[in-house]
């Protein structure tokens, strides 16, 4: 496992953003783990998270020249990532959307740098159903930008349903024709748990969950 994956998972565990136990997801599935990016709730935690994103993005070799954060969780993530890149000597423009359009002031649903003519990297926490990402793709294209990739913190690598054996991330990538990369995925989480004495007891539930709901790429 590459260093940014290990650092991210340990950071998430320390921040209580990554928890193990029994959790009922929105899908109704009973999961042995739960990830909540909202627990990266301080400047130091968010800055460290952004460095993990930057390392994962650079390792993937994505080509982009603007960062876009979908409302709501994508906004602080993209902002922190822009700061991380600035610290590495690359000053990237940044934009995000509102959930509700304003009819006063600058108006509209977009805030930040113009998207026209830009290669846009979308930054979010996870892709669950893919609704927010699909909305972001439409917004970017309508504003004259070109989506070039999507970066998320954690890919659960779960099938959408027994009828559709793809994950939400795989479905979005296929529809949009762009790469979706994650700082870490379920396979990384399994390796991380196996190497952590405090988490060894969760190996069996994690493996069982992957066997039931995992895509063909989780091995």
UniProtKB/Swiss-Prot annotation:
Pfam families: Pribosyltran. One of its GO terms (cellular component) is cytoplasm. Its EC number is 2.4.2.10. Its cofactor is Mg(2+). Orotate binds at residues 34-35, 128, 156. It catalyses: orotidine 5'-phosphate + diphosphate = orotate + 5-phospho-alpha-D-ribose 1-diphosphate. PANTHER family: OROTATE PHOSPHORIBOSYLTRANSFERASE 1-RELATED. This is Orotate phosphoribosyltransferase. It comes from the Bacteria. InterPro entries: OPRT, Or_phspho_trans_dom, PRibTrfase_dom, PRTase-like. GO terms for biological process: 'de novo' pyrimidine nucleobase biosynthetic process; 'de novo' UMP biosynthetic process; pyrimidine ribonucleoside biosynthetic process. Catalyzes the transfer of a ribosyl phosphate group from 5-phosphoribose 1-diphosphate to orotate, leading to the formation of orotidine monophosphate (OMP). Homodimer. GO terms for molecular function: magnesium ion binding; orotate phosphoribosyltransferase activity. Keywords: Glycosyltransferase, Magnesium, Pyrimidine biosynthesis, Transferase. 5-phospho-alpha-D-ribose 1-diphosphate binds at residues 26, 72-73, 98-99, 102, 104, 124-132. Belongs to the purine/pyrimidine phosphoribosyltransferase family. PyrE subfamily. It comes from Xanthomonas axonopodis pv. citri (strain 306). Pathway: Pyrimidine metabolism; UMP biosynthesis via de novo pathway; UMP from orotate: step 1/2.
């Amino acid at each position: 496992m590459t260093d940014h994956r290990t650092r991210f998972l340990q950071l998430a565990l320390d921040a209580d953003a990554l928890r193990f136990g029994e959790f009922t997801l929105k899908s109704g599935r009973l999961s042995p783990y739960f990830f909540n990016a909202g627990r990266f709730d301080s400047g130091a935690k968010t800055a460290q998270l952004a460095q993990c994103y930057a390392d994962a993005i650079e390792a993937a070799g994505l080509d982009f020249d603007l960062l876009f954060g979908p409302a709501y969780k994508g906004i602080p993530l993209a902002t922190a990532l822009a700061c991380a890149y600035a610290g590495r000597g690359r000053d990237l423009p940044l934009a995000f959307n509102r959930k509700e359009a304003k009819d006063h002031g600058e108006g509209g649903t977009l805030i930040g740098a113009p998207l026209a003519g830009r290669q846009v990297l979308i930054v979010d926490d996870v892709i669950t159903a893919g609704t927010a990402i699909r909305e972001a793709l439409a917004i970017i294209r309508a504003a004259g930008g070109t989506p070039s990739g999507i970066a998320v913190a954690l890919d659960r690598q779960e099938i959408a349903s027994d009828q559709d054996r793809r994950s939400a991330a795989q479905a979005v990538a296929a529809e949009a024709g762009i790469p979706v990369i994650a700082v870490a995925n379920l396979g990384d989480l399994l390796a991380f748990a196996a190497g952590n004495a405090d988490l060894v007891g969760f190996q069996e539930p994690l493996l069982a969950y992957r066997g039931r709901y995992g895509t063909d790429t989780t091995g």
